[in-house]
Amino acid sequence: MMQKFKILVTRKWPKKVEDKLLTTFDATLNVEDRPLSEAELVEGMKSYDALLPTVTDPITDKIISTSNKKVKIIGNFGVGFNNIDIDSAKRNSIVVTNTPEVLTDCTADIAMLLMLGVARRGSEGEFHVRNKEWTGWRPTHMMGTKVTGKTLGLIGMGRIAQALSLIHI
């Protein structure tokens, strides 16, 4: 029987993902969801085949350049990877991956939420309700403006703008 790859997951990931990791690999999860210390990450580099950090985990040259390291791949959870010293990973022949499109639709949804919140004064209304300042309905109070029939201007047409344009159609 082939031995499963040992992986260290540095933070809490979605349950379905963690379940899949546990069945596919010899996975160690961070059930406390606390940031691992530099010393713990260095030890992880020595003890695991793969390190699965998030964008909030600084994976520095000191961590990557650990002597007697076992890690061959760093699979970052998130679109960005500026938390990882890429030059150090290259020098140490460690593959670095990320999830570039994982947040495209989510970010487009948030952009739509912000547009609706501003146009319809949603955030302002929510603030009044939470602070028990809501005095009841009045015909023109907090009316805002409709987004229907408006023109949406998008600067650049990257992944997020394209997704937003599909929501807005």
Locations of regions flagged by a protein language model:
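An N-terminal-biased, well-structured beta-alpha scaffold segment characteristic
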Residues: 2-97
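Electropositive phosphate-/nucleotide-binding environments in soluble metabolic enzymes
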Residues: 15, 35, 105, 109, ...
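Short glycine-/small-residue-rich flexible loop motifs, especially phosphate/cofactor-binding loops
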Residues: 19, 86, 126, 137, ...
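Rossmann-fold NAD(P)-dependent oxidoreductase module
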Residues: 20, 110, 114, 163-167
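Short, structured secondary-structure boundary patches
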Residues: 50-54, 77, 114-122, 158-159
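Short donor-sugar binding/catalytic loops of nucleotide-sugar-dependent glycosyltransferases
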Residues: 80, 102, 157-158
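Phosphate-binding beta-alpha-beta segment of Rossmann-like dinucleotide-binding domains, i.e.
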Residues: 100-151
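Rossmann-like dinucleotide/phosphate-binding beta-alpha-beta segment
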Residues: 140-168
